[in-house]
Each structure stands twice: as structure tokens, then as C-alpha cells.
């Protein structure tokens, strides 16, 4: 279907399907400054992405090792039905296959967090990414998606039903993983049940869903699906199709590790606020999405974080006799810090780090407060 002429001139829209080359607007320098290695573990080396099976009695130990060393892991045995995951992927593919004129009805406006368009992070960069995205809050799913399907017909009802079922499953899984993370910090099951802050986090944790479509690219060596970044919230579940493209950054030596596309598995990324919450014992992971010449790729990020008014600081249970490494911040405050970091090249986490014992003593009382 040809692109309407008014859309072809709209700077917010790029017709990836019609592209025969990568224009300068989408060409990124420095993509190959570091080598890329296989993370499947086929060679038995140190770059195998960790796997956590929630059915394993030693799952908490595996989470601790992965969160401390990698900041990410593949999650198996999570209990989310495979047929639901397949339905979610099919629904996402169908949504991005809609005509451009229909998708543009839901375009994300400046200052908005929800809607269709480029990744939200793209506003910080002069180059464009080889991807389309759609962001919505599960709490407002039906009203958000009416922008895309104003007549609320069959496609709208089916998409909403699939995403609502997925949200129910994922929200329950998030609570289980939060408990596993706390056990990984060294708490027993009984101690976790008694931690007041754990209940506050579980009860107030909010979710956001971001859908991604990475079209096949005529010159993938020049383009990038999603710029390298860390997630800002607590932790993220990533559901990806069976086309690899997610890469994690590793030091010593610096390299990109391609996460294998394992049927039924999800990727879990530790976010910046969870690094703060655990006082740096679990660290966020720098990651990106690359594109390829032969296949489209679909992914879904299910992001968990605190409500906007809640201050996040290191858990007392994570300190283990050490001073707090970070000051208390709300999520919006931290996003403001990240904006400065993007424009200056600084580290947002370093910008909220604290160094004095007095500051540390004050901030540990603020773990999760209004």
C-alpha cells in the first residue's frame, strides 16, 4: 500500500517498508567500536547469558549471581502460558502492520508518555532509530488504544483482551520475582514476608508496556533499532520474538553479547532504580537492539517501577552494614537527572550517588515514602 503523500512529508513518520537504503537521518556512527559475541553459551565460554529457572529450588542463588554480574538474565519456568505469549506476539505484529494513516492517529505528542512513534528515548538524539513503538499503561489500556481504534471494533477488543490477560499474568509474575530478588539479597522467606518495605513496593509497583517493531533493514551495519541505554525503573521483562537482536554490554574486555532467542523464555533487565534500591548490589544493564537484513523483529518491554510520588532509596536490608550509596529520588526526579545525563554524557546514577555518612543516614529512612 503506498504511503499517503501527507505522511511521507511528516517528520514523525518514516516508511521502513519502502526504504532501499539507510538515509543519513538513520545512520549511526560508532556502532562497531566493540566486538559482538554470541551469548547462547554454545562455546561454553564466559559470555553465556545466565538462565534462571523459577522452578529450581536454587533460583534465588542464580538470580543473585546474574543480577550482581550481568544485571540481566533469561527467565524460564515463569508459568506464563506459551499460547498467551504467542498470542501477544501475533497481536503486536498485527498492530504494527496497520496502515500508517491509522497508526498516526495515535502518534505520541511532545510531552506525552503513551502512544505510537519512535522510542521515547529518541528525543535525546539527533539520529533516528530503525524501529516503531507503541507505549501504554495497562491501567488505561482501553482508553489509550481507542486512539488507534476509535471505532472499538473486533480488532480493538481482541487486542485489549490479549494485553489485559498478559498484564494479569505479568503483574503476578512481577510480585514473585520481587520476592525472589529479596531472597537473593540474603533474606529468608520468613524475613521477606516480614519486610514492610517489600509489601509497600509490591502493593504500589506500577507497570508500563512498550511494544517494539524492528523492520528488516537494507544496511543493518549503519542502522540501530534502539540506542544503548539502561532502563530507569525497578526491573523489566522483555518478551522477544525468535529473531535475536537484544545485546547486553559487558566489560573486561568491552563487548556486546547477543541474547539468544529462546522459545518461551523472557529476558529480565535490572533497572537504575533497582540498583539504587539494592544499594548497588544488583546493577542495571546497558543494552541495545540491533536490526538485520532478512527479518523483522518484535519485542515487548513490561516495565515495573514506583508511583511518581514515591521516593526510592537503598533498602535497609541491602546495606549490610555499609552506608547508602545513593540519595532518595522519585522516578520523575530521576528521569530529570537522566535527561541531563543524556545531554552532557554523564552517568545518571553517579549524579544521584552520595558520599557522606550523614547523607547516607538520612536517605536510608526514605526507602519508599510519600
Swiss-Prot record:
Cystine crosslinks: none
Binding site for Fe cation: 229, 231, 287
GO biological process: gibberellin biosynthetic process; response to light stimulus
Active site: 297
Residue intervals of the Fe2OG dioxygenase domain: 205-306
Enzyme Commission code: 1.14.11.15
InterPro entries, per database record: DIOX_N, IPNS-like_FE2OG_OXY, IPNS-like_sf, Iron_ascorbate_oxido_reductase, Oxoglu/Fe-dep_dioxygenase_dom
Keyword Thylakoid attributed: no
Known catalytic reactions: gibberellin A20 + 2-oxoglutarate + O2 = gibberellin A1 + succinate + CO2
Cofactors required: L-ascorbate; Fe cation
Keyword Iron in record: yes
Enzyme class: oxidoreductase
GO molecular function: gibberellin 3-beta-dioxygenase activity; metal ion binding
PROSITE patterns: FE2OG_OXY
Tissue: Expressed in internodes, nodes and the ear of the elongating stem.
UniProtKB keywords: Dioxygenase, Iron, Metal-binding, Oxidoreductase
Described function: Converts the inactive gibberellin precursors GA9 and GA20 in the bioactives gibberellins GA4 and GA1. Also accepts GA15, GA44, the 2,3-unsaturated GA5 and 2,3-dihydroGA9 as substrate. No activity with GA12, GA53, GA24, GA19 and GA25. Also possesses 2-beta-hydroxylase, 2,3-desaturase, 2,3-epoxidase and 13-hydroxylase activities.
Sequence similarity: Belongs to the iron/ascorbate-dependent oxidoreductase family. GA3OX subfamily.
Protein name as catalogued: Gibberellin 3-beta-dioxygenase 2-1
